[in-house]
Amino acid sequence: MGFVKVVKNKAYFKRYQVRFRRRREGKTDYYARKRLVIQDKNKYNTPKYRMIVRVTNRDIICQIAYARIEGDMIVCAAYAHELPKYGVKVGLTNYAAAYCTGLLLARRLLNRFGMDKIYEGQVEVNGDEYNVESIDGQPGAFTCYLDAGLARTTTGNKVFGALKGAVDGGLSIPHSTKRFPGYDSESKEFNAEVHRKHIMGQNVADYMRYLMEEDEDAYKKQFSQYIKNNVTPDMMEEMYKKAHAAIRENPVYEKKPKREVKKKRWNRPKMSLAQKKDRVAQKKASFLRAQERAAES
């Protein structure tokens, strides 16, 4: 079929239908969302869970959600800004932090449903492929599907770091090793050791060592927070190992105490009737005193 020019006449504008708001804003890929949300018709009221991963400039957000007509219901959430509690105070948006956030989400969710002792996941991090399988006589493994949003799902993306953390934490998420760091598209082989290095922050540590030797000023500028918190390249692996153990030990979210805010009043409050009468009496008395002084003088 040849090129057909769109004639923008009166009928075109009269029948024009705008796209969904979140599509107009460039926030939602409805082609992907439809496939992530719609459940099999023979499963009736069973929700289809999604593991939502979003990476911002300063944070990594991981959520487990399911769709309802009223809107998405969030079952559990974990954030990279919670990691300082577990000993990771710097680099909260790198691949290693994404793994920790995914692990925290998985352990928190399973703890909430009382399944954390049944599905321990992969305790020893080796970067290799791991899949959670349901145990006979126990509740089935919690299954969900990765929702990467509008992120480019290229090999080594941080979204897959969060996915790997959640899988190692005990969630059943369908995936392959093709998008993990360490996969070679030419030889079609996966190097688990390269992936493990990324999970343990060794790629960052290697770059830190390189900058320390080559450009001291660039190192001080780029890794100022690492220097401030006394984090050296040799400490990185141990820091993440301790963080993984701490997350497994206590993944429960602690609510912050509510701050009591004293309300300030910027305008004058209304006067009662008694106050108004008293004010009038004071003004009268003041006026009469002024009249008397004027008469005396």
UniProtKB/Swiss-Prot annotation:
Name the principal localization, coarsely classed.
Answer: cytoplasm
> Which keywords accompany this UniProt record?
Acetylation, Cytoplasm, Isopeptide bond, Nucleus, Phosphoprotein, Ribonucleoprotein, Ribosomal protein, RNA-binding, rRNA-binding, Ubl conjugation
GO (cellular component) term, any one:
cytosolic ribosome
The molecular function GO annotations come to: 5S rRNA binding; mRNA 3'-UTR binding; mRNA 5'-UTR binding; mRNA binding; structural constituent of ribosome; ubiquitin ligase inhibitor activity; ubiquitin protein ligase binding
Q: Where is the composition biased (Basic residues)?
A: 258-268
Q: Name one Pfam family in it.
A: Ribosomal_L18_c
N-acetylglycine occurs at which residues? 2
Q: Where is this cross-link: Glycyl lysine isopeptide (Lys-Gly) (interchain with G-Cter in SUMO1)?
A: 220
Q: Which residues carry this modification: Phosphoserine?
A: 185, 272
Q: Which residues carry this modification: N6-acetyllysine?
A: 5, 48, 220
Region annotation (Disordered) ranges? 253-297
Give the signal peptide range: none
Q: Which CDD domains match?
A: Ribosomal_L18_L5e
Q: Which InterPro entries match?
A: Rbsml_uL18_euk, Ribosomal_uL18_C_euk
* Superkingdom as given in the UniProt entry: Eukaryota
- Sites of Phosphothreonine modification: 232
Tell me the residues linked by Glycyl lysine isopeptide (Lys-Gly) (interchain with G-Cter in SUMO2): 220
Q: Which PANTHER family match?
A: LARGE RIBOSOMAL SUBUNIT PROTEIN UL18 (PTHR23410:SF12), RIBOSOMAL PROTEIN L5-RELATED (PTHR23410)
Q: How does it assemble?
A: Component of the large ribosomal subunit (LSU). Part of the 5S RNP complex, which is a LSU subcomplex composed of the 5S RNA, RPL5 and RPL11. Component of a hexameric 5S RNP precursor complex, composed of 5S RNA, RRS1, RPF2/BXDC1, RPL5, RPL11 and HEATR3; this complex acts as a precursor for ribosome assembly. Interacts with NVL in an ATP-dependent manner. Interacts with RRP1B. Interacts with IPO5, IPO7 and KPNB1; these interactions may be involved in RPL5 nuclear import for the assembly of ribosomal subunits. Interacts with RRP1B.
Tell me, what does this protein do in biology?
Component of the ribosome, a large ribonucleoprotein complex responsible for the synthesis of proteins in the cell. The small ribosomal subunit (SSU) binds messenger RNAs (mRNAs) and translates the encoded message by selecting cognate aminoacyl-transfer RNA (tRNA) molecules. The large subunit (LSU) contains the ribosomal catalytic site termed the peptidyl transferase center (PTC), which catalyzes the formation of peptide bonds, thereby polymerizing the amino acids delivered by tRNAs into a polypeptide chain.
Q: Quote the protein name from its UniProt record.
A: Large ribosomal subunit protein uL18
Q: Provide the species name.
A: Rattus norvegicus (Rat)
Q: What is the lineage of its organism?
A: Eukaryota, Metazoa, Chordata, Craniata, Vertebrata
